[in-house]
Structures are given as C-alpha cells and as structure tokens.
Amino acid sequence: MNKQTSTPSQIHRLQQTIYENLPVGMELYDGDGYLIEINRGGLKMMGVKDKQDMLGINIFENPNIPVEMKRRLRAGENIRFTVKYDFDLAKAHYPTVLSGISYFEITVSVVLDENKEIDKFLFIAQDV
C-alpha cells in the first residue's frame, strides 16, 4: 500500500480552508487585546464585509463583553460565556450592517508564550 504524505504547503492550505469555512466565528487577538485575524464566519456574525474594518479593534474596549469576563481574560483564564450582543453599541467600534440584539456563545482560549505570559486570545463564537 502506497502511503501519501502531505507537504507543509498542502497542510497549510488545508488548515486555511478549514479556518475560512468553519460555521463559527473565529477571532484572534494579540496579548493586548487587539484583533489581528478574523475568519469569514466571524465577519458574517458581526455584519462586516471587509476584514480591514475590524482589524485593530480592542476586545477590552468592546461594551458588549462583560467586565467580569474582561477581568478573567486579563488574568489569563480560559473562559466560556453567553453574551447579549447589542449591535447598536458595536457601531461605535466598527461598521456593521446589523442592528438590534443577538446572543452568542463565546469560548476564549488564552495562548501563552514561552515565558507563560499572555501572547494571544483565541475567540470562538457561535450564534445561539
């Protein structure tokens, strides 16, 4: 039996395809809370067409994220919570075509660097 191995390039393309086509929103923030990456699912959930309109927003300035969740993130905790997301509040931070209220289930994984300092925050969100 001939076993085919994948090249690093093929693996990267596969990972990118999965990431872009997941039916959930994925957002990656740097250690200071600034958005550095978002997938198509995340853009759709936020009502934004152009990724550039969202890059650079800060999760700690988002009025829709509860203060307690922000505190826990700063402390380096992995968290999961449901949020009542008000798009009218969000419009002060990014241009969304949505308005009103949605509910999202959000899971956040804290990524640590080699010194065990917060390097990134990975948000996975789904509409509930």
What are the roles of these predicted feature ranges?
Residues N39-G42:
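N-terminal capping loop/helix in small sensory signaling domains highlighted by a polar->aromatic N-x2-3-F motif
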